[in-house]
Design a protein with these regions (language model features):
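PRPP-associated nucleotide enzymes
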Residues: 1-183
Length: 183
C-alpha cells in the first residue's frame, strides 16, 4: 500500500481484514438485540464516523442515525476531563433505544458524560459500542456494552482516529511513532 502516512506508523495493531470481520460480528450482535426496536445510532464525532458507517451497514436494522460533536481534549493527546457539547443531536430521544457509537473508550470521561446526559433526556435504553477499548487509561467507572478490540496504552490512529486531524483515513488501526506527537 502506498501512503505518505505509512512512515509515521510504528506498527499495525488491527488489520483491515480484522476490522471488517469484527465489525460484522458486532453488527450481528446489535441486530439480535435490537431487531424490531428501531434504535437510534449516535455517532460521536469526529472519530467514530468511519466505524459508524460500517457498523450500521453490518447490522441491517431499521434505525435512525444522529451525530454529536463533543470535546474533552485540551491538547492533541490528553483528555482535560471536562466535556463540552459542540453540536447536539436534533431528534427527541424520549423512549428511544440509543446506541452510542464511539471510536475509543479511553479515560471514559466523554462516554460517562454522554450516558448521563441522554438518560436525563429520556432514552429508553443506552447501549455503548466502541471500536477500541483502552482500559488501562480509564478514569471513570464505565464500560462498553460491546467493544471491538482491547488495545494497549499506545497512541493509536487510523479508521477514524486521528492525531491533529490527520491519519483518520488510514484503513487499519496503527500505533503512531512517538516522535510524531512528542513535544
Amino acid at each position: 500500500m502506498r501512503s505518505e502516512m505509512e512512515k509515521d506508523i510504528l506498527k499495525v495493531l488491527v488489520t483491515e481484514e480484522e476490522l471488517k470481520a469484527r465489525i460484522q460480528e458486532m453488527g450481528d450482535a446489535l441486530y439480535e438485540k435490537f431487531e424490531g426496536k428501531n434504535p437510534l445510532f449516535l455517532s460521536v464525532l469526529k472519530g467514530s464516523f468511519v466505524f459508524m458507517a460500517d457498523l450500521v451497514r453490518a447490522c441491517q436494522l431499521k434505525s435512525d442515525v444522529e451525530f454529536i460533536a463533543v470535546s474533552s481534549y485540551e491538547n492533541a493527546t490528553a483528555s482535560s476531563g471536562r466535556v463540552k457539547i459542540n453540536h447536539d443531536i436534533q431528534q427527541d430521544i424520549t423512549g428511544r433505544h440509543l446506541i452510542i457509537v464511539e471510536d475509543i473508550l479511553d479515560s471514559g470521561n466523554t462516554l460517562a458524560f454522554l450516558k448521563e446526559y441522554f438518560m436525563t433526556k429520556g432514552a429508553a435504553s443506552i447501549t455503548i459500542v466502541t471500536l477500541l477499548d483502552k482500559p488501562s487509561r480509564r478514569e471513570k467507572a464505565i464500560t462498553a456494552d460491546l467493544a471491538g478490540f482491547v488495545v494497549p496504552n499506545e497512541f493509536v490512529v487510523g479508521y477514524g482516529l486521528d492525531y491533529c486531524q490527520q491519519y483518520r483515513n488510514v484503513p487499519y488501526i496503527g500505533v503512531l511513532k512517538p516522535e510524531v506527537y512528542a513535544d
